[in-house]
Amino acid sequence: MTRRTSIERYRNIGISAHIDAGKTTTTERILFYTGITHKLGEVHEGAATMDWMEQERGITITSAATTAFWRGMAGNYPEHRINIIDTPGHVDFTIEVERSMRVLDGACMVYDSVGGVQPQSETVWRQANKYGVPRIAFVNKMDRVGADFFRVQRQIVERLKGDAVPIQIPVGAEDHFEGVVDLVKMKAIIWDDASQGVRFEYRDIPPELQAQAEQWREKMIEKAAEANEALLEKYLSGQPLSEDEIKSGLRARTVANEIVPMLCGSAFKNKGVQAMLDAVIDYLPSPADVPAIIGHDERDREIERHPADDEPFSALAFKIMTDPFVGQLVFFRVYSGVVKSGDSVLNPLKSKKERLGRILQMHANERREISEVYAGDIAAAVGIKEITTGDTLTDPAHVIILERMTFPEPVISQAVEPRTKADQEKMGIALNRLAQEDPSFRVRTDEESGQTIISGMGELHLEILVDRMKREFGVEANVGKPQVAYRETIRSTVTDVEGKFVKQSGGRGQYGHVVLKLEPQEQGKGYEFVDAIKGGVVPREFIPAVDRGVRETLNTGVLAGYPVVDVKVTLVFGSYHDVDSNENAFRMAASMAFKEGMRRAKPVLLEPMMHVEVETPEDFTGNVMGDLSSRRGMVQGMEDIAGGGGKLVRAEVPLAEMFGYSTSLRSLTQGRATYSMEFKHYAEAPRQVAEQIIAARGSGAAARG
């Protein structure tokens, strides 16, 4: 089977939006229009038609990725394949957005014409910057009262620091929103309501918009001309740029992440989505426009894979879902090569060969089984047993390990126990499945109490996972009070910390002796072990045991038994015994030395700090700020919400003080405020707070020995 669509005609895009910006409607309309053009294009070939279009107008993608085909609004483009990757709008699921950004080539940011740029929009924008994802912006809901396209343009420039370049301006607004002016063609596009926007016509620009259209067109052409010397020279010499030249200039600068083309419409009123699809094709990159993906081979040497079918197979698993009909579905993005169903691939991070049982392609609400996938494709595999989100799948003969996704450490934990004996076994299976799907969710058993502990990114995150356990797996569970994930670290350097483990009791004894140096590391650097032994005073074969001894001790700090982070440990000296020394003795000696060193190196307790944003009516601003301050919060700024919608308060607050915040915010503001919260960083807990925590843990390490 050969490729149906060349890789240059692929677009792997995400549609991301704040919760209320109308992402679902926009996506539904995309499926509606692409389905119709697909059907129109295929009927004469006698191919199967997609008759679900007539039966169902309300298609919502439950799938993580869906494939659509587009031949342009006027049917004048060669057929393009658009893979749409779903991205959630809620900030507690930043992790979901993060993993979809990792596999996108381009994004369409949807904004509400009234609300404009909102807190979650900023989070998504930052992640798109992190992965260098080119984007276009679609200002939706232009039929709403208070709609203002140009205000959203200013917000993208001022708040998000994006160079937003309108390539359309609206014709009318609110109830009188009729269509758009296409600034490239300099024509008005008016959609036909009777055909649900399938038909449209080009008209002359209304006279009252002519001057405004010319002004914005001039700005757009200037941005396009900066793409290369030839265009710039032509522009500066006063020669007009052709339609193709404008588009190629805008495309080059969008793909280079220098500008963000802006469009507008109303998905609900069937206006503008069709032109947005044309913009996806005109301005967003194909997999072939994106640089080769970098990875490492088994010896950790840097290698790359180009987006071509004749390269060895490489893919990234970006989402795992449990499907009631087929079991575990693994969604993956193919970066290079070809793979057929039935082929064996290697998961190098698990050192495990897996057979791809079946490969499925999602089309809106139906799935098609396909025999093979090519570079640039996004599909789902059935039959892969052991895999975690972010793992690489590769050709076993040409191994590459793609850059792992970075997942934040959980900041909150809860004990969870099954209600009945029957739930016990089901709960274990359910929790493991959920942890496989979501790497920011962890499950462990507490060694002392035997309880099952679940950890995640926030109260809401854990609530939803417990709810899914009940809904999808039928497990009833009781949940304990949330616990904060504190950490411990050191603030000063200590040298000559000695640890000696000696046992001579007849027969073969034990002997291990080490001298360590402990130093604080900058935040986020983690644990580092350095071997500085000279002259073989500690034999080479025992050095990994020293590292292991320290690593094991890191799990239990000396203040309150919390994990230790950001410490550099150097093995500087030691001694050994020809007969009695062994790995275990050096492991024990290292553990003793590290504990002693921690006590001497000014240990401190760290607590997770959250970035909190509260949207509140103006009357309650004082109450909200006072309440945040009483929670040891630092208010970092306040600004007006666009469209006279009250105030946005930004603050940094310790997670420990935020439990039950949604309830108290409701009572403070008569239920009229909303908030979002995401993990920011760890910070040293004030002395009084640390003392209380240490006391509550029964002086932690002392109690644990």
UniProtKB/Swiss-Prot annotation:
Residue ranges the record marks as coiled coil: none
Example GO BP: ribosome disassembly
Disulfide bonds: none
SMART domains, alphabetized: EFG_C, EFG_IV
CDD domains per UniProt: EF-G, EFG_III, EFG_mtEFG1_IV, EFG_mtEFG_C, EFG_mtEFG_II
Localization per Swiss-Prot or TrEMBL: Cytoplasm
GO cellular component: cytoplasm
InterPro entries listed in its UniProt record: EFG_II, EFG_III, EFG_III/V, EFG_IV, EFG_V, EFG_V-like, EFTu-like_2, P-loop_NTPase
Gene Ontology MF: a single term: guanosine tetraphosphate binding
Binding residues for GTP: 17-24, 86-90, 140-143
Keywords, alphabetical: Cytoplasm, Elongation factor, GTP-binding, Nucleotide-binding, Protein biosynthesis
Domain tr-type G: 8-288
NCBIfam families hit by this protein: EF-G, PRK12740.1-3, PRK12740.1-5, small_GTP
Function per UniProt: Catalyzes the GTP-dependent ribosomal translocation step during translation elongation. During this step, the ribosome changes from the pre-translocational (PRE) to the post-translocational (POST) state as the newly formed A-site-bound peptidyl-tRNA and P-site-bound deacylated tRNA move to the P and E sites, respectively. Catalyzes the coordinated movement of the two tRNA molecules, the mRNA and conformational changes in the ribosome.
Family of the protein in this entry: Belongs to the TRAFAC class translation factor GTPase superfamily. Classic translation factor GTPase family. EF-G/EF-2 subfamily.
Record HAMAP family: EF_G_EF_2_B
Name of the featured protein: Elongation factor G 2
Organism from which the protein derives: Bordetella parapertussis (strain 12822 / ATCC BAA-587 / NCTC 13253)
Classification lineage: Bacteria, Pseudomonadati, Pseudomonadota, Betaproteobacteria, Burkholderiales
